[in-house]
Amino acid sequence: MPEYVNWLRHASPYINAHRDCTFVVMLPGDGVEHPNFGNIVHDIVLLHSLGVRLVLVHGSRPQIETRLAARGLTPHYHHGMRITDAATLECVIDAVGQLRIAIEARLSMDMASSPMQGSRLRVASGNLVTARPIGVLEGVDYHHTGEVRRVDRKGINRLLDERSIVLLSPLGYSPTGEIFNLACEDVATRAAIDLGADKLLLFGADLGLIDENGKLVRELRPQQVPAHLQRLGSNYQAELLDAAAEACRGGVARSHIVSYAEDGALLTELFTRDGGGTLVAQEQFELVREAAIEDVGGLLDLISPLEEQGILVRRSREVLEREIEQFSVVEREGMIIACAALYQIADSDAGELACLAVNPEYRHGGRGDELLERIETRARAQGLKTLFVLTTRTAHWFRERGFEPSSVERLPAARASLYNYQRNSKIFEKSL
């Protein structure tokens, strides 16, 4: 079977979920200059064709720097913000104007050899962002550098209803007719909040947030962000992370940080279960909970391969439906990726931990320990004093977690009478 067939099948739930949703996508000026920019445009057009309502915000910092250098002007910053005097503002207007036209031209391609053939999409822009001056801070006059006052929510939604891609530039206008240079991250964040967007997608140079060990941080809650900001200092990763967290605090369900250098990063983040960047979300991305009858299908998908290998005892759908209240599960993006069951042994103060299983793709994230802790908590709440487990393959895992070797003779009578000598499982117990 071709690989793309399998990919489409797995992506279909996300295609349905994203249809008619509003996404704000921020692409910095470095991303527009990157060789991968053409692929990003193709992916944006694909999202539009799948029914996503798109607001695209572009940056222009390197383009402004180029124009300042060409005129022999020195850029000035204070606390990471550009000081935009009159001469600098001319460079800003020139850079933003040319960049906006170049992006519109890319989005208008309709060549037979292009993935955009037949798209015929419309790009809309205009005076949709109202700004105000930052003014004087710590004795420093920022001149024409501003901050977003509001975005035209009704106007943008009307354009989105007409199936246009809305393009916002890092310029804002005041009611008195002044022009202000804005940070594209500020524009994107405020647009996402004011529009009540479903997602804010921020492009950066890296795959996402990189931790102190050089590894990608895949998921964060907004309350975890300050610690990372302190570690990062004042680099661009910190700006993106701060924007993502601010959007979530403002009501945006999910913010994503992805790489403009990675071909397909946007699609991977949106149409696969684990994504390819960093997700900042208010709600839990992964949830440990008690199982419900609706989980039976997911449980069967999880445990059937292990049953075929002889690792787990076979359980039919009927058995799972009847015993579903004994199970705890780990759910990730609607998929059951781990489970465990607790059975109270009749006429005793002991219980049995059974059917502990973790999807092979998620076996190194501590989910087995999470489920074991949950089962032990449930057992104590039921007044149980001892927890037994019978296993053929994972004896060492349980030994490392406080289980001691036991025997059939130690099992309560009700469980000992059901022991399968042909399976010859090893027995362990743990005092609670």
Curated annotation (Swiss-Prot):
What does the UniProt entry say about where the protein is found? Cytoplasm
Q: Which reaction does it catalyse?
A: L-glutamate + acetyl-CoA = N-acetyl-L-glutamate + CoA + H(+)
| Protein name (Swiss-Prot/TrEMBL) | Amino-acid acetyltransferase
Task: Identify the keywords attached in UniProt to this record, alphabetized.
Answer: Acyltransferase, Amino-acid biosynthesis, Arginine biosynthesis, Cytoplasm, Transferase
Instruction: Spell out the NCBIfam families in the cross-references.
Output: N-Ac-Glu-synth, PRK05279.1
What GO cellular component term, any one, is given?
cytoplasm
Domain of life of the native organism: Bacteria
A biological-process GO annotation: L-arginine biosynthetic process
